[in-house]
């Protein structure tokens, strides 16, 4: 009272229970920090549990009330829930015990309710929350992953060894998957019944079957991925940062139709839930991203040092007149005429991407149309890739059970789409990979891998066209041996790639995503230790690269070196994409899985087109040049079946047609084939820039098998006699794959 009379402020007693915390601390943390003090002053040992409101009470004839659970889950402490989900992007690399008390962060909800409370139906709560969330919500995948964990805990599969008293088996289905049996088809026959049952069993840890690869001392270093792994990781981090922090205005969205091969067989919502092609194709590509993708392609290094035109309606610069081929005479190896290289650029552009680019630009082709062809062609190829089996070829792996394949079940080769746009996209030597807007529709890592593989194949084809033409079709002895060796390796790589596309497509669309039949695409260890996860391809590389004749060809031939870099680029990019798919398949990230699947398909189309060009040049050296060329036994038979299986992606060109097309393009460009060296003033040479990404990095490994995987060397002229359709287009069987 004396202070009040004197005009000074009066100090009040601290009876309000006010507490001091950091001003940025969350409200829930401030309340929990002050609760013990308030409870102690009020004489209570614990806070009183708030009773639920009357209209959320459990009905007397029901065990639980879904409305109460949904209300408590969604509305309870909603101010903090969004922050928890957003922080998941920044705390993914923290310790295993970080956030152990939060069921949403650990994917392991409590098995029983808190003491004194009613049991919670967490599965229903998660499903209701997923229904109200939009597709673009950043934490939707987190909710789906947690719901799958809850489902697996509440409905465990039955142990077949426990007898009939074991609980009934209920297959784990994807939250957004097809209904059981959506693929249709008949049941497997009695001969395959046991194997099919083993393939359909649930396999939650697919890496256990490949644990021996980690202990194998012969694979201590794994496949040499060189600088691609770091570049892919950096590209993935940049894409995450762009999606989180870059303001992107809403783009106009269009309706994405079903692939034509699936029309009338499945609902669009069910299909796009399993393969999110709508998310990749619905939004038009951003102009800035397209410009960055074009700049990244143009700034990439090339072994010849020249700028490559990829997607343009203007021919590259070149000199008209005589086209002089052949290696320059001199002491230095790996030389080529600069004039012939620039002429080969124009020739390659006209034979490949030039016609496609001008047709697309003239018809104003929309991005949705190319996506429609691409997804339909990939699904058609997946349905026929398993039929790569025939006379003279190595036995193909066993087919997947029909219940596991689902919508991709087929009994014969699926014919390609015959529409005008599909015919256009299937031509041009499989050059869709050079379309910048198409690569932009993929995510960061698949776009990088597609660019890396496409650039390597493009540089190799330049040297292939610059060294020989119709007047001088024969290559040197070292070049012929190297080209035949790469022909065998590329065929083996393409076989593995098409096999993976078949498995990955069935895994995405099938009703049993965790079945043991999909172990090859879900396991991560094989792609960390083997090229494309294949021990057969590993042994084929060892047999080819360690040959003394092959090493001699590498020492003197620029063509052998540049094709080695192309092979390493394709195998590295494809292996990285397969590993990306396995990583995202573990948490069922459908968008990233679909992007990796499309990236492998894009590389496979370009690989089949480049393989067709390589075969025609090698066969032309024997048929028109009169040179002896040897290939591995069974290579042409395997390629013939691969060409039939990949027919929905790319149309192969036989030898006579290729020779006529090349001569016609040279006449249009006013190029005159000359078999002699160039005259004075035109004798400028170019030397191949050696790179670390060369096939020499594959030297010095040990084979995994005790028996050779490649057949003996045979004359390609005798092998072509058994496959006349590769030369003249005649002699095909009554149906695809029937030779």
From Swiss-Prot:
Give the compositionally biased regions (Basic and acidic residues).
1-13
- Indicate where this protein resides in the cell: Virion tegument; Host nucleus; Host cytoplasm
Give the range the annotation lists for the signal sequence: none
- Keyword Transmembrane helix attributed: no
Q: Where is this motif: Nuclear localization signal?
A: 10-30
Region feature Disordered, mapped onto this chain: 1-123, 154-198
BP-aspect Gene Ontology terms: regulation of DNA-templated transcription
- Entry comment on modification after translation: Monoubiquitinated.
Write down a Pfam family by its short name: Herpes_UL47
Give UniProt keywords alphabetically. Host cytoplasm, Host nucleus, Host-virus interaction, Late protein, Transcription, Transcription regulation, Ubl conjugation, Virion, Virion tegument
Is Cell membrane one of the keywords?
no
Name the residue ranges with Basic residues bias. 28-53
Residue spans of biased composition, Acidic residues class: 62-87
Residue interval(s) of motif Nuclear export signal? 94-121, 483-493
Give the residues annotated as coiled coil. none
Q: Read off the domain note.
A: The nuclear export signal is CRM1-dependent.
**Subunit structure, as described in the record:** Interacts with US3 kinase. Interacts with UL31 and UL34; these interactions seem important for efficient virion nuclear egress. Interacts with UL41/VHS. Interacts with host DDB1.
In which family does this protein belong, per the annotation?
Belongs to the alphaherpesvirinae HHV-1 UL47 family.
Extra information? Expressed in late in the infection.
**What does this protein do, in the record's words?**
Tegument protein that can bind to various RNA transcripts. Plays a role in the attenuation of selective viral and cellular mRNA degradation by modulating the activity of host shutoff RNase UL41/VHS. Also plays a role in the primary envelopment of virions in the perinuclear space, probably by interacting with two nuclear egress proteins UL31 and UL34.
Identify this protein by name. Answer: Tegument protein UL47
